[in-house]
């Protein structure tokens, strides 16, 4: 008998008449998250050959918020790479680049 189970992560996007997102909500039952509000999401999946992605943000998200979101997302990708591969050097390179980018675009330590 198998102990396999299925987990569900759900994203709900409300759009205006022009199909621009006005509200993003998400749930992840296993994490205890139900109908939580989000301003943006970046979903990437790997089909064995290429990464496919869906990136959405609500119409009220500011340019500065998007810059922070992108830099934070890049840092979490570095963390995921390190956990999956134990390649500290590659993850460190991503973190270094991201830190430099954050400073250059005004959302890093030099901007504070």
Stretches found by the model and what they are:
Residues 79-112:
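C-terminal charged interaction modules
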Residues 1-13:
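Structured beta-strand/loop patches that form or line metal/cofactor-binding pockets in enzymes
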Residues 4, 22-86, 90:
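Active-site- and interface-proximal helix/loop "cap" or "latch" segments in soluble metabolic
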Residues 16:
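Acidic surface patches and DE-rich sequence motifs
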């Amino acid at each position: 008998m198998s102990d396999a189970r299925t987990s569900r992560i759900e994203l709900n996007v409300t759009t205006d008449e022009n199909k621009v997102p006005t509200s993003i909500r998400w749930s992840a039952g296993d994490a205890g998250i139900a109908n939580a509000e989000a301003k943006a999401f970046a979903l990437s999946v790997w089909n064995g050959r290429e990464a496919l992605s869906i990136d959405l943000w609500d119409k009220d998200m500011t340019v500065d918020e998007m810059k922070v979101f992108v830099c934070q997302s890049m840092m979490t990708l570095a963390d995921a790479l390190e956990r999956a591969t134990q390649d500290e050097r590659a993850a460190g390179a991503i973190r270094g680049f991201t830190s430099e980018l954050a400073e250059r675009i005004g959302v890093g330590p030099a901007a504070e």
